[in-house]
Amino acid sequence: MSKTLSFKTYSAKPAEVDRKWYVVDAEGQVLGRMASEIAKVLRGKHKPQFTPHIDTGDFIVVTNAEKVALTGKKEEQKSYFSHSQYPGGVKIDHVKDLLKKRPERIIENAVWGMLPHNNLGRQLFRKLKVYAGSEHPHASQAPVEMKVN
């Protein structure tokens, strides 16, 4: 006799989640398209046991952040705005300057904008590791290369 069909909704438990490590080479990749794929894997939406309120995602290591591609005139025109809530506390970072000083920050900002802005989102964001060059210290985790279209 076969098993009976069950119509119960599956909810993943944190202890049951199997986490993998992936490495993404950002060289020549379009920033937004790459960031959306990374956010999907960090969130765990690529897994059949995805549960919205549980961290079911995997770890992502991004290398060559300094060689990420920006379409259009974004390299000259795009900027990130922040304010310290004090008078005169406006801080504007231009992408052109960030590519020279902190290229990791560009990918981090793009991915953070695609994650939920709550406690779960901060937990997911901690699983993203971004490096400007091609070297990373996570070889012992044996990350699998992930292709991004």
Curated annotation (Swiss-Prot):
Any one GO MF annotation of this record: structural constituent of ribosome
GO CC annotation, single: cytosolic large ribosomal subunit
Keyword Ribosomal protein belongs to the record: yes
Function: This protein is one of the early assembly proteins of the 50S ribosomal subunit, although it is not seen to bind rRNA by itself. It is important during the early stages of 50S assembly.
Matches recorded under PANTHER family: LARGE RIBOSOMAL SUBUNIT PROTEIN UL13M, RIBOSOMAL PROTEIN L13
Subunit description: Part of the 50S ribosomal subunit.
Name the UniProt record assigns to this protein: Large ribosomal subunit protein uL13
Native source organism of the sequence: Pelodictyon phaeoclathratiforme (strain DSM 5477 / BU-1)
